[in-house]
Amino acid sequence: MTFPHRHLLGIEALRPEEINTLLDLADKYAALNRQPDKHADALKGLTQINMFFENSTRTQASFEIAGKRLGADVMNMAMQASSVKKGETLIDTALTLNAMHPDLLVVRHPQSGAVDLLAQKVNCAVLNAGDGRHEHPTQALLDALTIRRAKGRLHRLSIAICGDIAHSRVARSNIMLLGKMENRIRLIGPPTLMPSGISEFGVEVFNDMNAGLKDVDVVMMLRLQKERMDGGFIPSEREYYHRFGLDADKLSNAKPDAIIMHPGPMNRGVEIDGTLADDINRSVIQDQVEMGVAVRMAAMDLLSQNLRLTRGAE
């Protein structure tokens, strides 16, 4: 099975078999990453530019490590000091970079759709590292790989996504991916943080944690995205934790072997009790971080193969 995509802009364009192709390759890279010599040559001779218009620590580091382990020449652009801050448009930036002939662009941007726009203006492969509230495809893919490794499968599971659904690109990408793989998805959160009409996407909506977590296999907690809120979405963090934060009492409604996930960064004592986050028997949060590097290696490997084929045919 090939991966017939020039870019990785979102989950929406991926078919289930393409998702499995990427995850299968990521599994191999996960094994490589545990070896003393973690390097491969899939991106040897290629240039990777990371452009983060939003602050990021873990995602940018993950992409940088992934590129370097595959042999790419990796450049991190300081967008806070770039020409964009001096008035240059995103399109002008894209055209300027395109003239330098990079091979892969990794882009995070605060505006939904900005990465798609940039991809239309360049000749290289583009990976969406998160755009506004729209999508975060590699996060959904690494979550999927984490679930598959922990549960032995990625289908017919009951999965609860809890918290700030309305502002979360992670939730959007996960809903699409997990839905494509025939899972039962439950969304749990206050009405103020639930997108209108979301039940039309084949998910179940709950405003009560105890009811929503009943017999689920996976509990995925989300961060409160305060930077995207422009009003009083919650009474207080203390009240939010009381009603929607994951603690032992609420978790007792899930299956005994249910796993706990969080895309990070975590607000301990707001979305999740710190003891649960560190529970080595239930929490797979650090596994998510580990799988992030493997998934991004797989994504860039597959896109680079198409890039070389395209250039070879020109």
From Swiss-Prot:
<keyword id="KW-0808">Transferase</keyword>
<dbReference type="InterPro" id="IPR006130">
    <property type="entry name" value="Asp/Orn_carbamoylTrfase"/>
</dbReference>
<dbReference type="GO" id="GO:0044205">
    <property type="term" value="P:'de novo' UMP biosynthetic process"/>
</dbReference>
<dbReference type="GO" id="GO:0005829">
    <property type="term" value="C:cytosol"/>
</dbReference>
<dbReference type="GO" id="GO:0006207">
    <property type="term" value="P:'de novo' pyrimidine nucleobase biosynthetic process"/>
</dbReference>
<feature type="binding site">
    <location>
        <position position="223"/>
    </location>
    <ligand>
        <name>L-aspartate</name>
    </ligand>
</feature>
<feature type="binding site">
    <location>
        <position position="139"/>
    </location>
    <ligand>
        <name>carbamoyl phosphate</name>
    </ligand>
</feature>
<dbReference type="Pfam" id="PF02729">
    <property type="entry name" value="OTCace_N"/>
</dbReference>
<comment type="pathway">
    <text>Pyrimidine metabolism; UMP biosynthesis via de novo pathway; (S)-dihydroorotate from bicarbonate: step 2/3.</text>
</comment>
<comment type="similarity">
    <text>Belongs to the aspartate/ornithine carbamoyltransferase superfamily. ATCase family.</text>
</comment>
<dbReference type="InterPro" id="IPR036901">
    <property type="entry name" value="Asp/Orn_carbamoylTrfase_sf"/>
</dbReference>
<feature type="binding site">
    <location>
        <position position="136"/>
    </location>
    <ligand>
        <name>carbamoyl phosphate</name>
    </ligand>
</feature>
<feature type="binding site">
    <location>
        <position position="59"/>
    </location>
    <ligand>
        <name>carbamoyl phosphate</name>
    </ligand>
</feature>
<protein>
    <recommendedName>
        <fullName>Aspartate carbamoyltransferase catalytic subunit</fullName>
        <ecNumber>2.1.3.2</ecNumber>
    </recommendedName>
</protein>
<dbReference type="Pfam" id="PF00185">
    <property type="entry name" value="OTCace"/>
</dbReference>
<dbReference type="GO" id="GO:0006520">
    <property type="term" value="P:amino acid metabolic process"/>
</dbReference>
<dbReference type="GO" id="GO:0016597">
    <property type="term" value="F:amino acid binding"/>
</dbReference>
<dbReference type="InterPro" id="IPR006132">
    <property type="entry name" value="Asp/Orn_carbamoyltranf_P-bd"/>
</dbReference>
<feature type="binding site">
    <location>
        <position position="264"/>
    </location>
    <ligand>
        <name>carbamoyl phosphate</name>
    </ligand>
</feature>
<comment type="subunit">
    <text>Heterododecamer (2C3:3R2) of six catalytic PyrB chains organized as two trimers (C3), and six regulatory PyrI chains organized as three dimers (R2).</text>
</comment>
<feature type="binding site">
    <location>
        <position position="265"/>
    </location>
    <ligand>
        <name>carbamoyl phosphate</name>
    </ligand>
</feature>
<feature type="binding site">
    <location>
        <position position="169"/>
    </location>
    <ligand>
        <name>L-aspartate</name>
    </ligand>
</feature>
<dbReference type="GO" id="GO:0004070">
    <property type="term" value="F:aspartate carbamoyltransferase activity"/>
</dbReference>
<dbReference type="InterPro" id="IPR006131">
    <property type="entry name" value="Asp_carbamoyltransf_Asp/Orn-bd"/>
</dbReference>
<comment type="function">
    <text>Catalyzes the condensation of carbamoyl phosphate and aspartate to form carbamoyl aspartate and inorganic phosphate, the committed step in the de novo pyrimidine nucleotide biosynthesis pathway.</text>
</comment>
<feature type="binding site">
    <location>
        <position position="108"/>
    </location>
    <ligand>
        <name>carbamoyl phosphate</name>
    </ligand>
</feature>
<feature type="binding site">
    <location>
        <position position="58"/>
    </location>
    <ligand>
        <name>carbamoyl phosphate</name>
    </ligand>
</feature>
<dbReference type="InterPro" id="IPR002082">
    <property type="entry name" value="Asp_carbamoyltransf"/>
</dbReference>
<feature type="binding site">
    <location>
        <position position="86"/>
    </location>
    <ligand>
        <name>L-aspartate</name>
    </ligand>
</feature>
<keyword id="KW-0665">Pyrimidine biosynthesis</keyword>
